From Swiss-Prot:
InterPro entries: Znf_C2H2-type, Znf_C2H2_sf, Znf_C2H2_type. One of its GO terms (molecular function) is zinc ion binding. The keyword Repeat applies. Gene3D superfamilies: Classic Zinc Finger. The gene is ZNF275. This is Zinc finger protein 275. Residues 79-89, 167-176 have a biased composition (Basic and acidic residues). One of its GO terms (cellular component) is nucleus. Signal peptide: none annotated. May be involved in transcriptional regulation. Residues 31-95, 149-176 are annotated as: Disordered. It comes from Homo sapiens (Human). The modification Phosphoserine is found at S76. Belongs to the krueppel C2H2-type zinc-finger protein family.
Amino acid sequence: MMSHPCVSLLGVPVLNPALVPHLAQGQVLLVSDPSPNTDPAKYSESTSATRHQMKGEDAQPQEMASTSFPRASGPSPEFRQHGDSDGKRGSPQNLPIEHHFACKECGDTFRLKVLLVQHQRVHSEEKGWECGDCGKVFRGVAEFNEHRKSHVAAEPQPGPSRALENAAEKREQMEREAKPFECEECGKRFKKNAGLSQHLRVHSREKPFDCEECGRSFKVNTHLFRHQKLHTSEKPFACKACSRDFLDRQELLKHQRMHTGHLPFDCDDCGKSFRGVNGLAEHQRIHSGAKPYGCPHCGKLFRRSSELTKHRRIHTGEKPYACGQCGKAFRQSSSLLEHARIHSGERPYACGECGKAFRGPSDLIKHRRIHSGLKPYECDKCGKAFRRSSGLSRHRRIHSGARRCECSQCGRVFKRRSALQKHQPTHHE
């Protein structure tokens, strides 16, 4: 015996709604397989007739599944076969039909128990599948699944901007976890409480570590240790590439990246790379505009503590860097280094355009503006531009009328120091 494909589905607990109209046509009986002695041609002809007649015959109750199915609709007009105008269900040959399953509420009869169960939901108003998003109720699982797709399509998807915000929030959270100690003054974070305590001295200007040689004070003892090597001329860390000496290993490692070109620290805002983490931190203040270092004398603010240190020497007159050849003193070590090249004749900074060499990098930068024509210093009064800041400062005296260069012999004042220097020899003649 060979069972019809729709009959085998009746044994499972869920009814495929697509099969309901098909089952309503009565195609649920078992179809006999051809016997070995049956002529294939006669079997094909008789089988077609038998299948046609089955559309009007009832299935035996014991052959049907007694399982209650979840959802159904009311009686469908599709149950009427072959144009029965009187609404009676039957085959083309008007075979008698037995209705084994009758509704107690309205008396309608059905060939299949599953159709009766589905029909009874019309009277009981039993609810089926309820949507958890909008509360709408469906009797059929197919309608319910189709309805669910509308909510899935309507759900907003995260856009690129939200994804970037999520990434930024995740980075901030990771930074808070990695550096739990935060400065209340500027928001800078630290891994250890000792680092925060050391940083707070920047805001309080506390410098508890004093140099016994010159009296200079420092916030951190390691800075004092480095400074003391200036007095002893001790620089135990030498670069193998250029033989330059350094006070500590960190300065040497940072310097060696100049030769290797390795810049491991990148700025998230502009992508610029740096050799050290301190250089990156100072650079990021350009984007944030933070200037946490203030001068106690004039109130001027700086992004770097080193800039404040150099600036304060203007007020104190301190010049801790003295030349060993002529005794001339300087406020900055870089100025002393450039000055020492006067005695040695060294000019390591050469122009790539004309080959002219200079003692310091700042002189080379100023010289390059001759070739590029760049004049970054512009007068806010008349708009005239200059290659050097000193040229702009001299020009501004024209608008202000200030004459600061006074001759000590005769009291005559000049706009430029060079003019005063030319004038002074006249008193010796």
